C-alpha cells in the first residue's frame, strides 16, 4: 500500500481533532529501504533488553507493525540487521522503536519499514524482561495494541482503526 502521511492527515482532519488519529513527535527516522509502511500495532515495553523483541519478531507478522517502547534509551540498540532479517522473513510490515537501531547498512537492505530515534553500535541485553500487549507511550501519543500505524519519511501516525 502506497500512501503519504501528509495526505492521510489532510483527508482525516476530523479524526485528528477527535484524537482518534494522532501524530508522533518528529523524532523518528527511517532506517530501511521501505518508503512507507503500515499495519496493525503489536506493542512491547522493554528497556535496554531485546530478547522479547526477538521472540516477537520470530512469530508470523502477517503485515503487522511492532511498536516498541524502549524508554527512549540511546545507550544501546534494540534492533539490528539480524532482527530486521527475521522480521522480513516472518512477514512484518514494520517496526516503530522508541530507542535505537544498529547495522544501518544491513537495515537499508530489508523491505521491512523501520522507524527509530537514532543509531547506537552497542547491542541490548538479552534478559527477557518486558511486557507485551500493553499500551505504550511514545513521544507524542499513546499506542494501544490493535491500533493502526502509518509511517513514511514525513512522520508516524497512530489511528484507532484502519484508515480508508
Swiss-Prot record:
Cofactor: how and how many bound: Divalent metal cation.
InterPro entries in alphabetical order: RraA, RraA/RraA-like, RraA/RraA-like_sf
Keyword Metal-binding in annotation: yes
Pfam families: RraA-like
Recorded superkingdom: Bacteria
Keywords: Lyase, Metal-binding
Binding residue positions for substrate: 80-83, 102
Positions of a divalent metal cation binding: 103
Quaternary structure note: Homotrimer.
Function: Catalyzes the aldol cleavage of 4-hydroxy-4-methyl-2-oxoglutarate (HMG) into 2 molecules of pyruvate. Also contains a secondary oxaloacetate (OAA) decarboxylase activity due to the common pyruvate enolate transition state formed following C-C bond cleavage in the retro-aldol and decarboxylation reactions.
The protein's name: Putative 4-hydroxy-4-methyl-2-oxoglutarate aldolase
Origin species: Paraburkholderia xenovorans (strain LB400)
